[in-house]
Amino acid sequence: MTIKTKAELLNKWKPLLEGEGLPEIANSKQAIIAKIFENQEKDFQTAPEYKDEKIAQAFGSFLTEAEIGGDHGYNATNIAAGQTSGAVTQIGPAVMGMVRRAIPNLIAFDICGVQPMNSPTGQVFALRAVYGKDPVAAGAKEAFHPMYGPDAMFSGQGAAKKFPALAASTQTTVGDIYTHFFQETGTVYLQASVQVTIDAGATDAAKLDAEIKKQMEAGALVEIAEGMATSIAELQEGFNGSTDNPWNEMGFRIDKQVIEAKSRQLKAAYSIELAQDLRAVHGMDADAELSGILATEIMLEINREVVDWINYSAQVGKSGMTLTPGSKAGVFDFQDPIDIRGARWAGESFKALLFQIDKEAVEIARQTGRGEGNFIIASRNVVNVLASVDTGISYAAQGLATGFSTDTTKSVFAGVLGGKYRVYIDQYAKQDYFTVGYKGPNEMDAGIYYAPYVALTPLRGSDPKNFQPVMGFKTRYGIGINPFAESAAQAPASRIQSGMPSILNSLGKNAYFRRVYVKGI
């Protein structure tokens, strides 16, 4: 099998991608959708169900823009133009028409990375740099981590001397250097400028972090990083009879993750009498109507799955560095004066929400090292709030929600907030919330991946007992996660192992998304 280049795929499928009268496909998506077309074509060239006479007849009365009657070959220009050459005897073109209309409407193209698969399984590889020569050793930590700073003593003084870690009740000595691991920013080295005793009540990580920050603010502990003296460096690794002084080493590992295709399938049965009466009274074709129902339902379910996975894996927002002291974690409450910063009227409180969104977006950049959050998924009420206030540095006026399109009967894309965030409406949200997420300029730069394999497979048969017709559709695709999505883990062995999201590797851990519930609107 010859593997086509991106340019070859775009050239082959250009008539279908840009067909007159068909929904427009953005240039950035055309290469991906061309690959999906290629996978679909490969499937119906080899699968016998596409050549079933009854299925061909069922498809013969609808999707005329994508039929090529009697054409067993494949001509993308004819598909786009709706040209036929006789009775429909092969339904591949008609199925392609359904794919052409449905696939671009998936929200996954806007908020996920889209990676079409060539086979039922796909692989994602990640290279990780590690402190130490053994990348799988217990306690080994990953280097170049976007969230945690470098171990600034690893190649310097830390290679020759091990510094004690600060803990509750530790009494410091002036001039001595100590080490501490901050939960949010990683390892630091601190020199004592005065003698202090660490609070005995700092018994957990959060309390110890707060106590050490307090001592740093008071000037009792000062962050330091330093190289080793030349006299020590030249003796390392057993030089001139010295012992117990090895050079520090680094290594790397390549992790493999597997993504497997899943399936969705639906069927519908109807009576011959229903089909006859529907045709006679309403001029409608039962096959055409049911095909549209099944294909649309599958698309809507995939859309919902993508949104659910994002919210499922999103970190709890308004926590850590985005939490305003004194307010509730994970919730932005318009009735809480701390959250709205003492706002005098609604417009000011709405602007406080904008600032919280900015904080979450910046936190995504800090944890992922890829970029600030650039899209928002939110409930209707939250989108109305965003549409009712200006985003400029101005008086906090509140007005009618004219900034966005909040009518989900037309589109779930509401608009662009402040020139920074693409806003999408979760029309089925059970309570008010917003999720800030990041998707980069290429399809690998995302928190989760939608990986279509075979976009649509039609099936048709009859019940062996009553001979009534039955039709169905299948779709196969995978959902994958970015191997670097769990930013809080620095030990390579504890990073994501499976390529598919689960409660163990995803629930509340994906740094590419942050979700905040909203109350009191």
Swiss-Prot record:
The record's section on HAMAP family has:
CAPSID_H_T4
Top-level taxonomic group: Viruses
Keyword Transmembrane helix included in the entry's annotation: no
Q: Under the cellular component aspect of Gene Ontology, which terms does the record hold? A: T=13 icosahedral viral capsid; viral capsid
- Positions marked as site (Cleavage): E65, A66
- What name does UniProt use for this protein? Major capsid protein
- Homology family: Belongs to the Tevenvirinae major capsid protein family.
Keyword annotations for this protein?
Answer: Capsid protein, Late protein, T=13 icosahedral capsid protein, Virion
| Maturation and modification | A proteolytic cleavage by the prohead core protein protease gives rise to the mature major capsid protein during virus maturation.
Main function: Major capsid protein that self-associates to form hexamers, building most of the capsid in association with pentons made of the capsid vertex protein and one dodecamer of the portal protein. The major capsid protein self-associates to form 160 hexamers, building most of the T=13 laevo capsid. Folding of major capsid protein requires the assistance of two chaperones, the host chaperone groL acting with the phage encoded gp23-specific chaperone, gp31. The capsid also contains two nonessential outer capsid proteins, Hoc and Soc, which decorate the capsid surface.
| Assembly | Homohexamer. Interacts with the portal protein. Interacts with the capsid vertex protein that forms pentamers. Interacts with hoc; one hoc molecule associates with each capsid hexamer. Interacts with soc; this interaction reinforces the capsid structure. A total of 960 subunits of the major capsid protein forms the 160 hexamers.
